[in-house]
Amino acid sequence: TVVQVTVSKRLKEGSYMSTLPRPLNPESDPRVKAVFDDIRASRGSDFINNLWHYLAFDPKLLEDTWRDVKAIMATPSSLDPVTKELIYAAVSIANSCDYCIHSHTAAARAKGMTEEQYAEFLSIVSLAGRTNHLLNAIKVPVDPEFDHT
């Protein structure tokens, strides 16, 4: 498939060298299977992405991570789903997490993000990066009006 070819190409290029092997049959562990089943049910899809496969080496870590992701990203809240994904993508850009940038940009698109919205998002990320660097270099003092007391 396209995903396998892309992953294989990236692995050959050496850009995605995991520090752990991908578990071969993670669902043989009942705790992992329960999490994977909940991911499938929550997303309405049979696709389990690499993040979850790799975290399956430690069922407790997998359970804890999915619990938090589900509570924040997959539960209705005051933020709409596209906004949540774009916030996650912006933080992922700041943290240089290539996997997260790709997965959350894809999730934002799947949840209805338009190309116009993506272009605006990238403009904001670019502007924030540039002005953050400028202000850090200049060491501009914070206005007292911005302090929360």
What are these regions (language model features)?
Residues 10-149:
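Hydrophobic alpha-helical segments
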Residues 2-7, 13:
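Acidic, Ala/Val/Gly-enriched low-complexity intrinsically disordered segments
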